[in-house]
């Protein structure tokens, strides 16, 4: 396991910062042009004069996978020249490496090779072991690495191969069909043999009897094993034996005489320190019986009977005075892990937090079993019973990182992450750890993008972070994942709703570059698809409302997105929504906010100059004076009155914003002058009169649901001396914002030279008195704000 998550002295959780060497690798991995360039054939090659020693080459491959994307042949080509590059230890996971790339690597006379989830390597490349295996000391062929097996999952025909790697010390095979001619006798140095999920068929473990240094034998999910036990008992030097299985549902792992079988193993393998019998019944039922004290019909000695009384696992009676260092009892029959007297220093099981975390540590490369362990962790966190949070978090992140392609692992891990993160102070997670959690979630969601459960878990966990600040480092990738959730999942489903909520949050409070990216990815057209669907069905829901809010955000000070809105028949959808859902105040507020952004773009304003649009905008000026009807269903008259008052206040708040935005749209249109007013009715003068009348009805202390990043569009209207009514709206907007939110907006007025512009307005002869009065309010408010800052300082 990685064990990177640390519990800091202040109680926070974080990861160790990158070392200087790791930072250098990160820089190199993100900028391959430092050492390479594209050749005439389009492939990347090392630059002339570049020579990379072994330490750098091994570290580069390791860190490229850590900091970048899975390795492919294009990167491996950097190591074609074995005179200028040198590889010894290669660990590949989730790589798209082909057989050609693998040969490039193996020509380096590797010391260790590990392949996991490398789907592109086929059995046709197994000859590479014969050609280049002489130097190998460690060979690990994990899940989906088909070098010695056929890719078809149900294919049980063995590949005819021999292990022509005479110096192997460690061999890991996963799911390989072992043929009876397979030889091991020549592997004199072999000490660690892992045959997880291998099919023995006619192969006998007696072939291992001639290995003088074999100390570890892993037979996880290998069955049937009962007929191989005598061969195992002959491996007297074993220190570690694993005969566990992931599930006993098919009858495997169930022994006729479990106590005697385990006792036989203990009698013969006296050097064992690590034993795993998870999933089996070898721990017995915990009850002493006459039969359980007999081995092959022979009575146990009085000494053995005395030892038996000290353990609840009869077959381990001989180890009560010499306990095992590790014992795997995960999902054993009769809940062996919950017994009291277990002769082992460390136990993997599901009885408590310590056993679960131990299981996660030992089973880190067994995705099916590890998924169950994560489910156990999930239940611990769900009921807030987990104390060793930093270890648990490290376990989950490591599991998800190692088994990216294993969907159920990602689903289980993301659910556990949600409960780890949920409800905890954001400051308790350091920046490095936060980034790791978010990156791991995005990796899983991206890999399993079509699975709604994975998306739901990921989205929910992301809502626990501070948006958009915490995700800016992965902003573009997250947007793509959210767009999929919005457009490719069930209409009105939970995944779609939470995806559009997050998308809207990310569209807010980001800079212009990110808003441009949103537009380029098709956010506007995606929102139109959602809106069109609901208009067709005459359905109003939160997705419809948030879709307009999202477009409001992405068009803010982003002219090209405003154009995308108009080009996508945005005004047509606006009118249809207005007519179909006339009483939806939130919807109307969002739509008019968006049109306010469009109206700020001078070269787009002519498209708003139609009689129909202007009449609608003028009518919406009077939104604040509309009547309101609120139905009451409360039994209490007092409750009904309060409900009416609250609804009325909310209605007035939303209608004020509609009126304000409508006036803003008209002010910008009118600022282009009388010649640009190309319609006869309503007349420009009539609309401006109505706009001023609306402004005079507004409360200068009204709160706002808006975020101005710049006052440039408003200040441009302050300079519009040809049309004082436009200035009226502009100075009122500044006065309102600086009165209600002085800390934020007084500073913005000053930064954008607003005080000088307002003073010029006051000195000018054109604006009428009310405009100048409001302008003075803004200046006075900003002056008082500056004085407060001096006093506070």
Curated annotation (Swiss-Prot):
Keywords: Leucine-rich repeat, Repeat, Ubl conjugation pathway. GO terms for cellular component: Cul2-RING ubiquitin ligase complex. The keyword Hydrolase does not apply. The keyword rRNA processing does not apply. InterPro entries: ARM-like, ARM-type_fold, LRR_dom_sf, LRR_Zer-1, ZER1-like_C, Zyg-11_UBL_adapter. Coiled coil: none annotated. LRR repeats lie at residues 84-108, 187-210, 269-294. Belongs to the zyg-11 family. Serves as substrate adapter subunit in an E3 ubiquitin ligase complex CG12084-cul-2-elongin BC. Targets substrates bearing N-terminal glycine degrons for proteasomal degradation. This is Protein zer-1 homolog. The lineage of its organism: Eukaryota, Metazoa, Ecdysozoa, Arthropoda, Hexapoda.
């Amino acid at each position: 396991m990685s064990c990177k998550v640390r519990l800091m002295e202040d109680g926070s959780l974080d990861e160790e910062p990158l070392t200087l060497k790791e930072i250098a690798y990160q820089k190199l991995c993100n900028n391959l042009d430092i050492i390479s360039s594209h050749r005439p054939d389009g492939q990347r090659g090392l630059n002339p004069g570049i020579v990379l020693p072994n330490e750098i080459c091994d570290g580069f491959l390791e860190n490229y996978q850590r900091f970048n994307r899975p390795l492919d042949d294009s990167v491996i080509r950097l190591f074609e020249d074995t005179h200028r590059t040198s590889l010894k230890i290669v660990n590949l996971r989730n790589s798209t490496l082909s057989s050609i790339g693998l040969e490039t690597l193996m020509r380096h006379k590797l010391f260790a090779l590990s392949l996991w989830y490398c789907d592109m390597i086929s059995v046709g490349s197994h000859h590479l072991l014969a050609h280049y295996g002489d130097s190998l000391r460690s060979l690990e062929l994990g899940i989906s690495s088909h070098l010695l097996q056929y890719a078809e999952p149900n294919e049980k025909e063995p590949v005819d191969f021999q292990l022509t790697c005479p110096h192997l010390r460690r061999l890991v095979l996963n799911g390989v069909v072992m043929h009876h001619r397979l030889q091991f006798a020549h592997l004199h140095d072999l000490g660690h043999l892992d045959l997880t999920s291998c099919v023995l068929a006619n192969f006998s473990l007696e072939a291992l009897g001639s290995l003088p240094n074999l100390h570890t034998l892993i037979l996880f999910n290998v069955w049937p094993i009962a007929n191989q036990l005598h061969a195992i008992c002959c491996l007297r030097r074993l220190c570690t034996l694993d005969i566990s299985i992931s599930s006993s549902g098919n009858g495997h792992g169930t022994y006729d005489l479990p106590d005697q079988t385990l006792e036989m193993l203990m009698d013969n393998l006296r050097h064992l320190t690590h034993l795993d019998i998870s999933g089996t019944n070898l721990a017995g039922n915990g009850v002493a019986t006459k039969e359980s004290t007999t081995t092959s019909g022979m009575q146990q000695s009085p000494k053995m009977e005395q030892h038996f009384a000290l353990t609840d696992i009869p077959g381990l009676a001989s180890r009560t005075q010499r306990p095992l260092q590790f014992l795997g009892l995960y999902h054993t029959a009769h809940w062996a892990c919950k017994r009291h007297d277990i002769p082992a220093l460390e136990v993997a099981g599901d009885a408590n937090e310590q056993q679960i975390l131990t299981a996660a540590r030992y089973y880190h490369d067994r995705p099916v079993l590890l998924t169950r362990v994560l489910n156990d962790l999930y239940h611990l966190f769900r009921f807030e019973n987990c104390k060793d949070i930093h270890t648990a978090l490290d376990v989950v992140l490591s599991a998800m990182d190692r088994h990216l392609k294993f969907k159920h692992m990602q689903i289980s891990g993301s659910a556990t992450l949600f409960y780890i993160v949920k409800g905890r102070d954001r400051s308790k997670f350091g920046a490095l750890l936060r980034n790791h959690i978010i990156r791991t979630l995005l990796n899983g969601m991206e890999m399993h993008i079509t699975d709604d459960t994975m998306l739901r878990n990921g989205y929910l966990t992301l809502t626990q972070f501070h948006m958009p600040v915490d995700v800016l480092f992965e902003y573009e990738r997250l947007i793509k994942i959210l767009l999929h959730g919005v457009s490719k999942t069930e209409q009105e489903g939970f995944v779609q709703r939470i995806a559009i909520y997050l998308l809207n949050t990310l569209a807010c409070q980001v800079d212009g570059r990110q808003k441009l990216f949103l537009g380029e990815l098709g956010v506007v057209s995606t929102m139109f698809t959602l809106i069109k669907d609901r208009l067709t069905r005459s359905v109003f829901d939160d997705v419809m409302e948030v879709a307009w809010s999202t477009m409001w955000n992405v068009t803010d000070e982003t002219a090209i997105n405003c154009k995308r809105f108009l080009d996508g028949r945005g005004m047509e959808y606006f009118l249809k929504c207005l007519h179909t859902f006339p009483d939806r105040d939130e919807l109307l507020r969002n739509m008019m906010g968006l049109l306010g952004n469009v109206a700020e773009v001078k070269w787009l304003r002519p498209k708003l100059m139609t009689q129909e649009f202007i009449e609608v905008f003028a009518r919406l000026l009077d939104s604040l004076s509309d009547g309101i009807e609120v139905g009451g269903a409360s039994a209490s008259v007092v409750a009904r009155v309060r409900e009416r008052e609250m609804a009325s206040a909310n209605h007035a708040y939303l209608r004020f914003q509609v009126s304000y935005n409508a006036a803003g749209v008209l002010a910008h249109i009118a600022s282009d002058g009388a010649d640009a007013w190309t319609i006869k009715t309503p007349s420009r003068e009539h609309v401006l009169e109505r706009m001023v009348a609306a402004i005079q009805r507004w409360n200068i202390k009204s709160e706002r649901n808006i975020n101005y990043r710049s006052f440039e569009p408003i200040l441009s209207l302050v300079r519009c001396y040809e049309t004082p009514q436009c200035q009226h709206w502009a100075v009122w907007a500044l006065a309102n914002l600086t009165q209600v939110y002085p800390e934020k907006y007084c500073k913005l007025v000053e930064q954008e030279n607003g005080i000088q512009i307002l003073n010029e307005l006051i000195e000018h002869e054109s604006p009428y008195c009310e405009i100048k009065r409001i302008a003075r309010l803004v200046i006075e408010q900003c002056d008082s704000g500056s004085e407060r800052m001096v006093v506070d300082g």
